[in-house]
């Protein structure tokens, strides 16, 4: 089997394709959550605590000197990323809870009794024919 053919078979397996779709959707979901935090949650939160913009929180380790830029730790961006993480983690937690609940309901449903085998059907027909013959005599 050629290398390219093996790679194609590997790449087209169900699990790999599902994983790729999950990664793409996860990246898009991450952008949505980041926008939710940065553009919707943080501005009112900053307004509630005296109009503070968290992105502006920073600690200067060394001032700029000539052509050398300042060394700054932007801990406000870190705070915003922590909010992002908490919201994503909560959303994933809720989604997993819902999926587990649906799976539990499916597991609780009683399974349909198995259909009789061909032998059982034939034996039943033979029994019925014998009963019919006995009733005639």
UniProtKB/Swiss-Prot annotation:
Keywords: Cell inner membrane, Cell membrane, Ion channel, Ion transport, Membrane, Transmembrane, Transmembrane helix, Transport. One of its GO terms (cellular component) is plasma membrane. The keyword Transport applies. It comes from the Bacteria. GO terms for molecular function: mechanosensitive monoatomic ion channel activity. InterPro entries: Mechanosensitive_channel_CS, MS_channel, MSC/AndL, MscL_channel. Its main location: membrane. It is a multi-pass membrane protein. The chain crosses the membrane at residues 10-30, 76-96. It is found in: Cell inner membrane. Channel that opens in response to stretch forces in the membrane lipid bilayer. May participate in the regulation of osmotic pressure changes within the cell. Homopentamer. Belongs to the MscL family. This is Large-conductance mechanosensitive channel. It comes from Salmonella paratyphi C (strain RKS4594). The lineage of its organism: Bacteria, Pseudomonadati, Pseudomonadota, Gammaproteobacteria, Enterobacterales.
